[in-house]
Amino acid sequence: MKRSEVDRSKLSPMMKHYVELKDKYEDTIILYRLGDFYEMFFDDAEVVSHALELTLTGKSAGLEEKVPMCGIPHHAAEVYIDKLIKKGFKVAICEQLEDPKNTKGIVKRDIIEVISSGTIINANSLDEKENNYIGSLYSFGYGYALTYSDITTGEVYSVLINSASDVLYKLLSLEIKEIITNNEIDKALISKIKAQKIPVTIEEYYLTDKYLEVYENIEDDRIIKSIQLLLYYLSEVQKRNLSHFQKVIIKKDNSSLMMDIHTKRNLELTECLRTKERMYSLLWLLDNTKTAMGSRRLKYFIENPLVDITKINERYNVVSKLLEEFILADELRSDLYEVYDLERLCGRISFGSANAKDLLQLKNSLKVLPSIKEKLEKINYYDEIRPLNELYELLERAINEDAPNGLKDGFLIKEGYSSELDELKSLSKGGKDFISNFEREEKERTGIKGLKVGFNKVFGYYIEVSNSYLSMITDDMGYTRKQTLANCERFINPILKEKEDIILSSEDKIINLEYNLFVEIRDKCKEYIGILQNNAKVISEIDVLSSFAYVSEKYGYVRPILNSTNEIKIISSRHPVVENVLKDAEYVPNDIIMDNNTDIILITGPNMAGKSTYMRQLGIIAIMAQIGCFVPAEEASLPVFDKIFTRIGASDDLVSGESTFMVEMMEASRAIKNATSKSLILFDELGRGTATYDGMSLAEAILEYIANNIKCKTLFSTHYHELTEMEKTLPNLKNKHVSAIEENGNITFLHKVKDGSVDKSYGINVATLAGLPKEVIDRANIILKEYETKENKKTSSVQIALPLNFEEKKSVVEEELKKIDILNITPIEAINILSKLKEKVK
């Protein structure tokens, strides 16, 4: 039965109210509160019963036949809501606004909140180490304004974006969970956004009269419209209180180191390229934070490195001080461990969803703030914490340490906080003591040893007598039979009912008073949200810097020197993640030196020798330096880069489905169009996706353009040995190679980067290592000699890559090698595989 097909005039009043609500929330599943259940009807019931594997039943609604219905217990609603959100649904909560016990007729109900993928606030449904962004995209004809916010923390950011393709990359880079946009948006762009599994809602209204402080002093009307669009959706459609929203931060091109999503992924900053997980990323290595806020802030630091030398050096100074004061630093980290997620606690307090557990977490966090403040003063930290002793004392005085999660379950408020509450509890306790004494006295009065006093919600308090004693009951005892069971009968008497009324009345009053007192205390906490958010910011940042100090000491990192001469001098540099994964194996460090006369290093050498790792480690060291962390080297001096561009690996485009070669050219184009002399370019074997001479020609032309026009620091690896001749014509290009030793046809990678170009190719040696059959290798050597004798051939060898699907099996190691996808393997994965193979041949 479809809602659109029913005769609404025949519907019951309750069901008529439901369908009227559903008309307003067509794209949303409505959970309609009825007693102890949330129920769904019509299409919603059919969809949800299928999605959650619930029983589909029916409900009388005034029609000839029952309407489809399914339901979930209200106390378990969060679990079901979470499942629906993960399946892509939006959920509206229609709550009872009146107590059914005290209401005649239909209970008043209304939508109190709408939950979607971008507006989840349930802590159990969120990753505490990740932000959960919802964004609004405002199209203004020649570009876009994007505002995005994590409503659980109140952070708000805005950015202007030039093109539709950049919009897609930005949404993916920020991992935005949901987009709100206006009708002016290009329909093709909406389709592409939806193709990335990002829900899109079209909204045409703007909130202009509330939360003005969020965009106070912002003059750009495009950004204002984007903010107002988001505020309207969250406030008016999703019924959210946004009083905790902070002033918007405008993200500008020159405010931080610019990196596109390809650079972030190629350098494996926040997730491993292959597994798409944190493990083996830079974030994974550096995250020794003690708070959830600190972990989220670290990710923000990594994705937004600084470009202001003064601010970077401020961070260095704190890290240095923490390394000097190592005992204090250890005590500080112990204090930080006691701090809960203040940012998200503020969000729940603002939304009015904070429970007693949340306020206890707030209290315990406030308890350690004076100690943290004292330690920060000792290291001359540049931001200040306000301890809020008065709020701590209020929570300490008021909230019961063992308070339940439910706000209507009682036991929320401590004894001594409210005299009225204490009196009610005393009255209730007196009544319960009477009940306990009443049972003993009745046993003595009647001589019935098997007499018990019990309670249930149907009969209240009752006297239970087992069948074997029923003959002892006489009329003068004043017992009235209420229920007969298999083994006993239950009775009431006037004295018991009189006390029952007193007890139950006082218990209801206790629960209601405790609830009201708790709400008052929670509302009092709202007054401190601004200060709490500032404290959260300070704590999250010092948590990150203490993590930097911890890993710097643990792994032997050094403080970089940031120069203005545009020179790079990094002695014995290491890739921090690869070094960590190797563990007991010896990591081979390399120098990276580029003076004022060197803009480009052209790197040659065999596959798997370490070219990509060498390039990545420069990019990662630059980013570590600009987020304020010490770096893996014996000595490091480098400039502050404004942008980093990379092309490393053979992954296809993330959104357009273009070929590898097209993506290579698009990324090269993006780099040479946008790079400045202060940028860093890392290109790994550019041009390999097309024919040899095409690729070589393009690579040479791009190198010339960078050398003559951009003149920025560039690492460019290649398998085109002919390009090494460019050192003779481009004075700012230097050749380097990754060395290897060949003995008796076997190759050993030294992973050492040396001056000059490689003297030969090792393609056939690598193919031998990969386990190609001997007859293939022998034939390849014959063909190689034929190529080398050709007069016009410029290269000494051609690296070959043949499919590894031969059936010959010689050893377990060979079989494992055959499974390796050489073109798509990451350095970390290669190291792990080599380590396992080494164990097998021991």
Residue positions per predicted region:
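Charged catalytic and DNA/RNA-contacting regions of genome-maintenance
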Residues: 1-321, 330, 334-337, 341-350, ...
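Beta-sheet entry/capping signal
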Residues: 28-31, 37, 88-92, 178, ...
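ATPase nucleotide-binding head domains, primarily ABC-like/P-loop NTPase cores
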Residues: 42-45, 220, 290-291, 295-301, ...
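A general alpha-helix detector
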Residues: 33, 281-285, 297-301, 318, ...
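Extended, charged coiled-coil "arm/hinge" scaffolds of SMC/Rad50-like chromosome-maintenance ATPases
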Residues: 485-523
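Short hinge/gating elements
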Residues: 59-70, 157, 211-217, 268-270, ...
